[in-house]
């Protein structure tokens, strides 16, 4: 996002110096990273997931590479269903829902979350990636009943206990949304 070019362009233009604006931005990013341990993905505002670039900010969890395995499993299992209906509970940035919608073009994918801020990021990613078959809704799965039945329910729910929160690295506990990490038990 700093250079506004592809990875290949970086290699091809490796010897090209940064202009004063780029250098200033880079210095501010380095300060944020070194001084605060702020995750690079939040500093740049994006991350890669399943080969695609997704917008992220401190309102959504940074997608983990391990989560890509969930995508692989659903893709593998969905082969037996002509038009699968899939729900992603706690969709956050929408990376799981949007990826499934793009990888399984005949699927209808629904992403739900209790955070309107997260849903804004999910919608932004949907629009930028031009995903037509994913739909995002504000919903608390513990209170509200989903509107239909689904062939697949996928989720990367909060899984860190309140006691474990203190043991997390500074860049996780100080920057990632606690609502996405813990159920506060």
PLM regions: where:
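Conserved beta-strand termini and adjacent loop/short-helix elements that scaffold enzyme active sites
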Residues: 45, 57, 137-139, 184
